[in-house]
Design a protein with these regions (language model features):
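A structural signal for multi-pass alpha-helical bundles of membrane permease subunits
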Residues: 5-270
């Protein structure tokens, strides 16, 4: 009985891994093929191995600038989201005030709202202020979604820190900024890592706002990938290569914060 159960679990695990890995493998496989081979021959690996698709990405400014633009506004958004979320999460975790639960619920409601709901207001506002097609436009728009999520994650980690630590620091003569930066934040560095990861990933993959609020100068890679149709048709090989390179930053970030994410799952905040 135990052996049969183990075999079933192993089978389900193998099937799940195949289901999860197959699309990634197929994209990598396509990235090393020519368009003719992609459209004409079914093969599990490239018959005519080529790096040309990746050469296009690294030499064509319309492609590699998309990665640069994405990194710029993702870095801005992640940093600003954490700077805004840290004091807010501390207030929710340490103080009770009139309407605190309602404010917290309102924050989470913003996070659960589809980006399309806010698209028209952002478009009109940025057009009026002259912020269209700028990195700051996308970064600020994503704050509406990342700050509530970061507050929710950080509040859970901060609530797990005993209040006695705050009181002891104040008795020892620590000012609040010094206590918060040198004592409190190191205690919740796992939460900061988890919050930064989710802020990064949302901004990195979000398409609707990034595509609508930019056109040329600040167009991110996710928007660039939706505009690959030329007179000769869809360039599938280049699109696959762009997809592979788009996965790489997320994979690197996951590698560095994997332990923090596991801790977040254990605390029920991820």
């Amino acid at each position: 009985m135990a052996e049969s159960r183990f075999q079933k679990r192993t089978l389900f695990l193998v099937l799940y891994l195949l289901f999860a890995i197959l699309p990634v493998y197929w994209m990598v496989n396509m990235s090393f093929k020519t368009n003719e081979e992609i459209l004409g021959v079914f093969s599990l690996w490239p018959q005519a191995f080529t790096w040309d698709n990746y050469k296009v990405i690294f030499t064509d400014a319309s492609w590699y600038s998309g990665y640069i633009n994405s990194l710029i506004y993702v870095a801005i958004n992640t940093a600003v989201s954490l700077l805004m979320a840290l004091p807010a999460a501390y207030a929710f975790s340490r103080y009770s005030f009139l309407g605190d639960k309602h404010v917290f619920f309102w924050l989470l409601t913003n996070r659960m709202t589809p980006p399309a709901v806010f698209l028209l207001p952002f478009f009109q506002l940025y057009t009026t202020l002259g912020l269209m097609d700028t990195h700051i436009a996308v970064a600020l728009a994503h704050l509406l979604f990342n700050v509530p999520l970061a507050v929710w994650i950080l509040e859970g980690f901060m609530s797990g820190v005993p209040r006695e630590i705050d009181e002891t620091a104040y008795i020892d003569g620590y000012s609040f900024p010094r206590f918060f930066l040198t004592i409190f934040i190191p205690l919740i560095k796992a939460g900061v890592g988890v919050a930064a990861f989710f802020c990064f990933m949302f901004s990195w993959v979000e398409l609707l706002m990034a595509r609508t609020l930019t056109s040329v100068n600040a167009k991110p890679i996710v928007a660039t990938m939706t505009r690959t149709v030329s007179a000769s048709g869809m360039d599938w090989g280049v699109l696959a290569a762009a997809g592979v390179l788009t996965i790489v930053p997320g994979a690197i970030v996951i590698w560095f914060v994997r332990n923090y994410i596991a801790k977040g799952f254990a605390m029920g905040r991820v």
